[in-house]
A protein has these predicted regions:
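Short beta-strand/loop motif that positions the catalytic acidic residue
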Residues: 201-203
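A conserved short beta-strand
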Residues: 179-188, 198
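Short alpha-helix in the alpha/beta-hydrolase fold that links the catalytic acid
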Residues: 117, 210-220
Length: 272
């Protein structure tokens, strides 16, 4: 009986080995090797195309208008700016308060486009901190504000804000950092529930980029006492200085005029 059982187990092992051999023979015969090769080429080609498309998308962004910014900054020698961390720049004026604003740029907009706005805030005594984003997308570094308050202990009250996508990501950050004083949204809305926080929302009457339906849909996420300002004649792009933006309305005022109105409104909001 034992001999018979042993013979059965031996036969099962041989059958299993034979089956495995047949499987690999079929897998690696000429035809299947050709199929595997073709499949590998197709997969590699798809990956290459996706990589190229991603590269094109991420490198297609709105660049700061260096000439216009240079002209604006000519008489701003009283404003200093310096790096406090990799990709984080602080703007300071002559008579600074103990309040600061951490700012997230709009989606696919070069951070330098907001130098004029940061300068205008610094002139009003607000410590303005501009955060550069990976591939100019704040969604890739929502926590860019981490550690900034610790590096500037002289600033006692911190607000966070941003333009467009940057504003939405700033709101997400505020949602998990209630120690901040409030938020400033420029042409933006909050998908996070920050109804218990102070909030200022500013957008232009000619804004053709911000989705008004989404703005109203997510309006309940903001406090009931929201301070809302509509800049008459302003558009979406003129919170920065990067030229015209696709789909945007034509502004009736200049970018500097819009940014000056914005800086004044932020100062008033902080002073309340």
């Amino acid at each position: 009986m034992e001999d018979s059982m042993e013979e059965g187990r031996t036969k099962e092992k041989k059958d299993l080995l034979r089956a495995l051999k047949n499987f690999f023979d079929r897998l690696y015969d000429g035809r299947n090797m050709k199929k595997i090769f073709i499949t590998s080429i197709i997969i590699a080609s798809v990956i290459a195309v996706i990589t190229i498309l991603c590269g094109v998308y991420l490198n297609d962004y709105y660049r700061a208008d260096g000439d216009e910014i240079g002209l604006f900054m000519e008489d701003k020698t009283h404003i200093t700016s310096y790096r406090i961390d990799d990709g984080v720049t602080l703007f300071k004026g002559e008579n600074m308060r103990d309040v600061g604003l951490i700012f997230y740029p709009g989606g696919k907009v070069e951070a330098e486009a907001y130098l004029p706005l940061m300068t205008l805030l610094a002139e009003r005594g607000i410590n303005a901190v501009l955060c550069e984003m990976p591939f100019n997308l704040a969604v890739l570094d929502v926590n860019a504000a981490d550690g900034i308050a610790e590096r500037l202990p002289e600033v006692k009250k911190w607000y966070i804000g941003g333009h467009s996508l940057g504003g939405s990501m700033a709101a997400s950050y505020l949602d998990s950092h209630p120690e901040l004083e409030g938020i400033i949204l420029l042409g933006s809305y909050s998908t996070a529930d920050i109804g218990d926080e102070r909030a200022l929302s500013i957008y232009g009457s000619k804004d053709g980029v911000m989705n008004r339906d989404k703005y109203e849909q997510y309006r309940p996420n903001l406090p009931k006492d929201l301070t809302e300002i509509v800049i008459e004649g302003g558009n979406h792009a003129y919170f920065g200085m990067y030229g015209e933006q696709d789909g945007d309305g034509k502004a009736d005022i200049t970018a500097i005029e819009q940014m000056t109105i914005t800086a004044d409104a932020i100062e008033d909001f902080i002073d309340q």
